[in-house]
Amino acid sequence: MPSLLIADDHPLFRAALRQAATDAVPDTTVAEADSLDGVLSALDTDPGIDLVLLDLHMPGNHGLAGLAAVRAQHPEVAVVVVSANDDPRVVRRALDHGAAGYLPKSSGLEELRDAVRAVLACEQWLPGSLRAAVARTQSSSTDTDLAARLASLSPQQFRVLTFVAQGLLNKQIADRLDVQERTVKAHLSAIFERLGVRNRTQAGVILRELELSDPARQLAD
């Protein structure tokens, strides 16, 4: 029985995704989260989740960092990015960072169903309206290299990197992870080496490079 996690901070959109998912695969079990912390907690708690429908912009996630976090900490889980942003360059970046599909929020219910069916069948999925444009969009060598470097981090190292990007000190990170401070320092040394950086500031910048502006918020402004 497939298991799916819907991650979006808008209840009405989560309800629409739930309906589409259960229509597409009737025996699917569906859980929900409204923040990136909720996503990672659900994945830690339930190792049986097969697919995450991940909003690019919700509490704790402002771009591709959430995708990178899920892929780094749970590489066995497929992720379909859900976003109001249908820029082919953003779609290409999401695919380069490990997304199994990309679903614009303007998609109809049938496209939602198609996406769920395809990705659960281990296929990559894009809406027909974006396929040609994305195919013409070249991957950025910088993005490809960044994705590879982030993928080289262990789940715990990625958590440490996330806290570093948030500006937390070693003691604070140790308290959050319930480990000793020297363990955090060891993780940082490994992170610096794998990312090819020299200090915390450079490491934090790498993760913040994955941030994207929110088109829905821009329209509201």
Where are these regions (language model features)?
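Recognition helix of helix-turn-helix DNA-binding domains
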Residues: 167-202
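Acidic catalytic/metal-coordinating carboxylates
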Residues: 35, 60-65
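Short amphipathic alpha-helix used as the core "switch/output" element in two-component signaling
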Residues: 64-76, 206
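Basic, Lys/Arg-enriched C-terminal extension of HTH/homeodomain DNA-binding domains
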Residues: 190-221
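Active-site residues of response regulator receiver
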Residues: 55-56, 83
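Acidic, metal-coordinating helix/loop segments flanking the phosphotransfer/catalytic sites
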Residues: 32-51
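Short, flexible helix-to-coil linker/hinge segments that flank and couple to helix-turn-helix
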Residues: 91-96, 105-151, 155, 209-212
